[in-house]
Amino acid sequence: MNFPCIYHVYSIRKIMFLVIVACLPGIFAKYYFFGIGTLIQIFFSIFISLVLEIIILKIRSKNIKNYLQDTSLVLTSVLFGVSIPPLLPWWMTSIGLFFAIVVAKHLYGGIGQNIFNPAMVGYAVLLISFPVYMNNWNERDFSLSFFNDFKKSAYIIFFKNDITTVSSSYLNIIPDAFTTATPLNNFKIKSHLKDDFFLKENIIKNKEVSIQTSWKCINISFFLGGIFLLFTKIICWRIPISFLSSLGMLSIITYFYSKELFMSPQVHFFSGGTMICAFFIATDPVTAACNNVGKIVFGIIIGFLVWIIRNYSDYPDAIAFSVLFANMTVPLVDYYTKSSGYGRNNI
């Protein structure tokens, strides 16, 4: 007999471990294109999260060992660390993690009781507070050895990344904006400055090809990790498929309506955090809808919001805001999509 409430037989600890393993292709791709700063951010995020978690557990008089055994904290840190720019200053990373661990998680009661995705709360706070830094994606310098790349990245992250330096680099829209932006940033820049005679068409095209290739490989890597999660039945197919389907349908319709005003489906699928959202963030079992129909509705809501925010807001990517808005709808979605009791016929 198959019980509807049981989907897999893994322990929580093993589930978290397998999700982290599934992240490895995407993490490696980000390291390859953006340098070792990505790895530094991930390990630093784990360290800061552990410190914050231990402090809060002590304040709440909880058993630290029991709470840390499920390794969910490590997964949150990995997802946060891989989502932020590789050269983000350490103190900004710490601020984001404070909101992720202390505010989004423990103020709601701890693991399993939070209504918002902790990693996305931390990311959204940083994106609103420090938009220049959060769009500063510096391409990797392939001329540097591993050790020199580590030394340079660590120096920038922990000692030299001040607001004056980063802001001044962004005052020169061309070519700096294109060397550090994502394809979603480029679409926004071109839509605002398409009549500016300073925009050299050959510069735009050359930079976009390089940037699009990087983010396409990154998203494909996270997609492969997501397929692994589906194959091992760690996640259900309903949220990723409904999210990607709704985003794809809207982008196809609007792109054919106006290629000047709307992003192409390729840009939507293979830029920013689309694939990590579909398979690793939106599928968070604590903050997503519970039943099967609700999961489909939840995924559709995220896809719709991503399309709206990317096309009509000033924020180039929309993953964090879309997931958090969708998290708010979960009680309503669950209420109106709940099935009748097990063993009863639907009316």
From Swiss-Prot:
GO terms under biological process: electron transport chain; transmembrane transport
Key word Transport present: yes
Keyword Flavoprotein set for record: yes
Location in the cell: Cell inner membrane
Pfam families per UniProt: NQR2_RnfD_RnfE
Keywords: Cell inner membrane, Cell membrane, Electron transport, Flavoprotein, FMN, Membrane, Phosphoprotein, Translocase, Transmembrane, Transmembrane helix, Transport
Gene Ontology CC: plasma membrane
EC number: 7.-.-.-
Names of required cofactors: FMN
Topology within the bilayer: Multi-pass membrane protein
Modified residues (FMN phosphoryl threonine): 182
Subunit structure: The complex is composed of six subunits: RnfA, RnfB, RnfC, RnfD, RnfE and RnfG.
Protein name: Ion-translocating oxidoreductase complex subunit D
Protein species of origin: Buchnera aphidicola subsp. Acyrthosiphon pisum (strain APS) (Acyrthosiphon pisum symbiotic bacterium)
Gene: rnfD
